């Protein structure tokens, strides 16, 4: 019982530490392996986060209101006498309740369940012949980045191992602005025209009458959308249940335009190839984990970074000239189609290393926004109708 109350007090201290606007920045607790060595692979760092925070922080004299004012107690309100009503002048009570009432935001319509991490992108190959993007201007250049991984259709709190595509959203903090590359773990998509997107998403949500998932609605839509077949075949293979977020690739899905310093332009597609390999769960394994550890993928990512086993991806691009695009037998701007690698081979660009966990999930991850229209000099949109709709 005593430990239960200690846990409640510690949780309140964590809340007040986040709320105090004049507080000092906490020391990071995410990377115990400062020398780059890998920690215990069997240790659940996510489950030990509160205990780790307690050991690395002195909780004395840090209980504050949202304006940074010291607070003597969060266990009792000001009252008129021992049994009297509470006082309207109790700023601490009102501040606490106001914060509680407003601390959440509406969940994302899609990609509501997700995990994220901070990292660094390093250029390994010269691609200035294709683009003048600041983050790619020279070999060895380093750019901070932020990646968010997610399922697509599930509501907040649902299992992150469900059979579903995985969102693979990237934000690069370049010297010429933030570049958002919003992709998936699969190289194609269900539809090619953005006007179909609202109807498609509705089929992934609850039936408006029964408030239950409805496979009939989904298959009605997909059966009338034959271009979705390439995506369906992937989602209903083991690719639809990757073993966590680290052991899967990422794809920009859409075609983009790259422009170099001379004003010359080519089309391109982005690929992120996992250095952790490609490991998937079987349907049985995914179903079991959804019931026993619905946050399995989030836990796996957090623990890997916490023990110093930093996940890495190699960025590669496919390049297509305007002349090649004009001679193709298919539409290269159709998000339901692949560019054949034998005709448009992968070109190495750089490597991403995720090396820091979020310190405040709501602040760092839940409030993170990714906008496909956030581009920087050197990259432009293509005629891809689905990409245009995202703008």
Predicted regions and their residues:
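Active-site-adjacent core segments of small-molecule enzymes
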Residues: 2-5, 18-391
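N-terminal signal peptide c-region/cleavage motif recognized by signal peptidases
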Residues: 14-16
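Sec-dependent N-terminal signal peptides
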Residues: 6-11
């Amino acid at each position: 019982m005593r430990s239960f109350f200690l846990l409640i007090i510690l949780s309140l201290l964590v809340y007040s530490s986040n709320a105090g606007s004049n507080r000092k920045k906490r020391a990071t607790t995410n990377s115990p392996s400062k020398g780059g060595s890998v920690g215990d692979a069997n240790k659940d760092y996510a489950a030990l986060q509160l205990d780790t925070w307690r050991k690395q922080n002195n909780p004395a004299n840090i209980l504050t209101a949202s304006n940074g004012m010291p607070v003597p107690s969060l266990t009792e309100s000001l009252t008129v006498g021992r049994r009297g009503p509470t006082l309207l002048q109790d700023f601490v009570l009102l501040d606490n309740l106001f914060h509680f009432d407003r601390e959440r935001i509406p969940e994302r319509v899609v990609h509501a369940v997700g995990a994220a991490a901070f990292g660094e992108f390093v250029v390994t190959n010269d691609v200035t012949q294709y683009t003048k993007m600041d983050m790619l201007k020279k070999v060895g250049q380093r750019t901070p980045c932020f990646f968010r991984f997610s399922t697509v259709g599930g509501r907040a709190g649902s299992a992150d191992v469900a059979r579903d595509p995985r969102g693979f959203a990237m934000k690069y903090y370049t010297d010429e602005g933030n570049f958002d590359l919003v992709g998936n773990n699969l190289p194609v998509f269900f539809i090619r025209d953005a006007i179909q997107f609202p109807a498609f998403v509705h089929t992934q949500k609850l039936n408006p009458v029964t408030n239950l998932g409805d496979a009939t609605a989904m298959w009605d839509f997909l059966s009338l959308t034959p271009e979705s077949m390439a995506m369906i075949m992937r989602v209903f293979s083991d690719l639809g249940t990757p073993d966590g977020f680290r052991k899967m690739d990422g794809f920009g899905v859409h075609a983009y335009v790259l422009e170099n310093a001379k004003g010359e332009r080519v089309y391109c597609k982005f690929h992120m190839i996992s250095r952790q390999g490609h490991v998937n769960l079987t349907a049985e394994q995914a179903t079991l984990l959804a019931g026993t550890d619905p946050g399995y993928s989030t836990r796996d990512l957090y623990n890997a970074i916490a023990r110093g086993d930093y996940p890495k991806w190699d960025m590669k691009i496919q390049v297509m000239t305007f002349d090649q695009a004009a001679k193709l037998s298919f539409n290269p701007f159709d998000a339901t189609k692949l560019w054949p690698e034998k005709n448009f081979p992968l070109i190495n660009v750089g490597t991403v290393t995720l090396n820091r966990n979020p310190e405040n999930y709501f602040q760092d991850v839940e409030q993170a926004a990714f906008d496909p229209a956030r581009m920087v000099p050197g990259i432009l949109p293509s005629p891809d109708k689905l990409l245009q709709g995202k703008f």
